[in-house]
Amino acid sequence: MNIQEPEHITMVRDSVRRLLDEIATPAHAAQWDKDDRIPRDLILPLAKLGLCGMAVPEEYGGHGIDIRGVLAVIEELAKRSAVLSGLYIANTIYGSFNINASGSPTQKQFFLPKLANGELLFAYGLSEPNVGADLTGVQTRAERRGDKVIINGAKRWCSGADTNDYIYALVRSDKSEDRRKNLSILLIPRATKGITITTTNTMGQRGVSTCDVSFDDVELPFEETVLGGETGWNKGWTLLAGPTLEAEKVQVPAMAVGIATAALDEAWQYAQERKQFGVRICAHQSVRHMLVDAKTKLLACKLMLHHCTELVAENKPAAIEVSMAKLYVAETCVQIVMDCQKILGAYGYAEGFQMERLVRDIIVLPIWGGSSAIQKNNIASMYRLPKD
């Protein structure tokens, strides 16, 4: 069964694969994981190839919004390196999509050309030490004082905050009792007085730091900092749940499919090369069944991803389908990678082999972008399933 993609998407995939053979070999990916550091300037050759411009309108120096292309790039990058895929997400999904959808004219003029050129990366500052799934409970506060905004509080699990240029932060900006009407989104330059950033070691996705960020009387210009300027003040929840939400969710299934594809490719090849009991292990029924099950599950994941991509690209309602894809694809791709690890045996467990890294990188995806439990709650609510 073939997934019919537009011809230009096939060309994009081919171009990305050729570029990766130059700038991101398997040895590079292994080294970034070992060092827990990926060079941020790797975004520049992606931009030079025009990949960052697929998230920016032509009038701002891009090639026009192409969600199909962006998600294809995320998938292809993740096959080689999840953290390289993360760099691209920090530029396109976190940066360009949000600013193009909700930024003020001044913000668009300032940010979008730089994002198209690969000059800027954004970190997501939504979660806090005491706030995870319930984002309406954020405690970081922003106070307006004339033409300034003063920020105090803390963010947690803010990937890339120590190296990326801006932090896209959800804050409480008013005392309204309706928790959805007193939130704003701020674009906070990392190198600002009053910001302290510390890092946390993580199991996987090594190369981009996971950070805690604290704000101590951080003072910034109001119009430049509040997403949308004056019209965005106290409209943060509307913007967060707005036109870019589905694109932000579907990037997780795209990364998951990329990682799972890499794992299955390796297991498929290994099973044809490894011999035990006088035959290749792919001749043993148990291994054959594991490989076929993985192939079947991966195709189902790709079909769900493709369906959601088309809905989002055509601006059709996709909230339920995207939540289902986030739930099913993330969970299923974890299963695929874990089964592929079993096929490699000890070689799938030992450091220095790609499979061990793929296992560590995939584990977090059912948590990212809204956990599987939250997706199930959301899906049930969207189907209006009674709670009493």
Q: PLM features: residue spans?
A:
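A short core secondary-structure module
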Residues: 148, 152-198
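Glycine-rich beta->alpha junctions and the first turn(s) of the following alpha-helix
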Residues: 3-12, 196-299, 365, 381, ...
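C-terminal helix-coil-helix/basic helical segment that borders enzyme active sites and/or dimer interfaces
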Residues: 27-34, 268, 272-279, 295-328, ...
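Glycine-rich phosphate/cofactor-binding loops in nucleotide/flavin-utilizing enzymes
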Residues: 2, 13, 72-73, 94, ...
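A structural signal for short hydrophobic beta-strand segments in well-ordered beta-sheet cores
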Residues: 140-143
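Amphipathic, small/basic residue-rich leader segments at the start of a protein or domain
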Residues: 1-87, 110, 114-117, 335, ...
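N-terminal glycine-rich flavin-associated loop
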Residues: 86-106, 132-135
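A short, Trp-centered hydrophobic/proline-enriched beta-strand micro-motif
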Residues: 118-126
